[in-house]
Amino acid sequence: SKPAIIDEDGIDPSIFNDDDGRRYMLLNRGARIFELNEDATKQISKAELLFYGDNKRAPEGPHLLKKDGYYYLFEAEGGTGPGHRITVSRSRELKGIYEPCPYNPIMRQNNPDEIIQRCGHGKPVQTQNGDWYMVYLCGRKIGDGYSILGRETALDPISWTMDGWPIVNNLKGPSALQVKPDLPEMIWEDESDDDFNNSYLSNEWWFPRVPEMDGIKLKDSQVHIKGSKYDLDTMKAKNILLRRQKHFRFSAVCKLCMPELYPGQNCGMTCYYDENTYI
């Protein structure tokens, strides 16, 4: 479908469909909400603040779930660093007073030595078997504390307390090992190789910036990259073709056909994070 432009400032949008058929969008700076038209392509009300969060620090990524007469509001709080967490609040009315969960944060890494850190942006899902899980973002750190694989997706079980609150993994934080859900197996086929036989690049390839006109072309099962006068240490360097690093340990092989290089010119493979960090 064609994209629908919603002219509202904010990030982390999510859609909530209420029982009466009305549709809403939520955005950050706390949990702001506004109503959409029937096909969710137009904003038809002003944004209102539902709740600014329990932690009151950088609340974002709001999601709503309606269950057993309550509206449950999930938010990511604490910033995207080590203090990142998931909190939940609830109200009997969509735009009522939201009560913070007494068990907040319902997901947070409390051990700085564990590999999985920065847990947030959680969204609850229920399987066809009735089991509940929390899908959330996290970062796996290496020895110096950096998460070189970026933000990754994790899954942990949700249980519901006697007083009707959702808690994740029994409040033990993220699990490095978890029981496999009783669901049909879906195997993801990773596209690790590319012989450039198509007329387009696959979605595995990325550019840090929009390439120059004819800067990168596919021809005769080869990818042709036009040279640039700019080095990798500047944001003006545009003709850079990259693939995301998905594993801590990996091998990368490519066949390069290079023209004659003159003093000051470079051509080859790079391990690239940004214009300040590359090898």
Listing of model-derived features with the role each one plays in the protein:
Residues 1-279:
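Carbohydrate-active catalytic/glycan-binding domains of CAZyme proteins
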